């Protein structure tokens, strides 16, 4: 789309699947490109693969140099390599197929720890042995070919055992595993990781758009809650009399339940939400307190959930319906392992 809109005139494609080959053919036939080149992605790190990749890199440099009427600049090439700093403190990682920037930002915003993007194309980096100025052009391309093929392998490589380093990090506290519709490579890895890691694991799927952003956001928030990492910006705790209120703020109705310290329901109210989730929640809570013959000061905590939970600033904690449903089902019957639907 960017090319056909005239925003890109020079493009190097990596031949990793049928889709890229089709894109290459379409762009070539369009006649809109000033420079178009496709380089093969080889699937193994052996001597003949390195030789083939080095030959392609040399041809690319020569072809592009002829197009730009410039020669290869070794100084600029060497300056392009910057050491990658890997995070050492507790963090979460996004693994799997490439994730769009908007979805990754949504993931970062929902999580209580730093999030590292380790999906396809984002975990690319060469080794620690960087090239030197003494290397000539041919030697540099041979070095570069070896480094490209010796990176953390993607799932298209014949030997992808090296990917285990992505989820065997001792500072890793959770994994969000992303797959793209109709890209089957990474679903196999998810099944393998699921059986070989003890850290919390969430699988999400997208079509590289934000079409299902609402559902994805709710699942990400529920996963964040399941990690059990407390928010350091909690409100000051005020002790009441052992009563707790739960507010479920829906688009149509607002439900309030008050429990005592023995987890017994002492009052419950269902009222129309009306104009504004916060106002509806306040009215319903006041009615529930009235039925229970309690004052607001008697409550130890107020927890909000549902469609309008983020609009209710009066609550002590806000959690997703997914978490509420899961914990509620487990409380009613601890044998439950799968929830099909509640609500």
Question: What is each of the regions a protein language model found here?
Answer:
Residues 106, 257-259, 281, 311-316:
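Short acidic, glycine/serine/threonine-rich loops at helix termini
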Residues 270-273, 292-323:
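Short beta-strand-loop/turn "lid" adjacent to the catalytic site in phosphate-handling enzymes
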Residues 244-248, 300-303, 337-340:
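Short glycine-aspartate micro-motif
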Residues 97, 247-252, 307, 342-343:
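A short acidic Gly-Thr/Ser loop motif
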Residues 1-244, 262-264, 274:
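An N-terminal assembly and electron-transfer interface module characteristic of large anaerobic redox
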Residues 247-279, 287:
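Short glycine-rich, Thr/Ser-proximal phosphate-binding strand/loop in the N-terminal lobe
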Residues 8-12, 91-92, 299-300, 314-316, ...:
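Short active-site oxyanion
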Residues 235-239, 307-343:
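Conserved phosphate-binding catalytic cores of ATP/NTP-utilizing and phosphoryl-transfer enzymes
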């Amino acid at each position: 789309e960017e090319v056909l809109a005239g925003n890109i005139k020079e493009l190097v494609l990596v031949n990793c699947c049928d889709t890229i080959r089709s894109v290459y053919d379409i762009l070539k036939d369009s006649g809109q490109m000033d420079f178009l080149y496709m380089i093969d992605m080889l699937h193994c790190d052996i001597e003949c693969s390195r030789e083939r990749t080095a030959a392609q890199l040399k041809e690319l440099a020569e072809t592009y140099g002829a197009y730009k009427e410039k020669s290869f600049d070794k100084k600029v090439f060497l300056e392009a390599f910057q050491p990658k700093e890997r995070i050492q403190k507790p963090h979460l990682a996004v693994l799997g197929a490439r994730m769009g920037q908007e979805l990754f930002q949504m993931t970062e915003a929902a999580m209580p720890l730093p999030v590292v993007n380790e999906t396809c194309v984002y975990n690319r980096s060469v080794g620690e042995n960087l090239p030197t100025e003494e290397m000539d052009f041919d030697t540099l391309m041979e070095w570069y070919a070896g480094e490209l093929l010796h990176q953390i392998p993607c799932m298209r490589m014949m030997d992808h055992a090296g990917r285990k380093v992505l989820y065997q990090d001792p500072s890793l506290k959770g994994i969000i595993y992303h797959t793209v519709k109709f890209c089957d490579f990474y679903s196999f890895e998810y099944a393998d990781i699921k059986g070989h890691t003890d850290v919390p694991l969430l699988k999400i799927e997208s079509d590289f758009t934000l079409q299902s952003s609402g559902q994805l956001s709710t699942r990400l928030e529920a996963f964040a809650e399941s990690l059990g990492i407390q928010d350091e910006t909690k409100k000051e705790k005020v002790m009441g009399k052992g009563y707790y209120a739960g507010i479920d703020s829906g688009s149509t109705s607002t439900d309030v339940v008050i429990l005592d310290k023995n987890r017994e329901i002492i009052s419950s109210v269902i009222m129309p939400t009306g104009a504004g989730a916060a106002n509806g929640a306040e009215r319903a809570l006041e009615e529930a307190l009235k039925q229970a013959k309690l004052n607001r000061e008697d409550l130890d905590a107020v927890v909000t959930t549902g469609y309008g939970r983020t609009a209710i600033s009066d609550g002590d904690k806000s959690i997703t319906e997914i978490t509420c449903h899961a914990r509620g089902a487990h409380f009613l019957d601890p044998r439950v392992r799968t929830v099909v639907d509640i609500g």
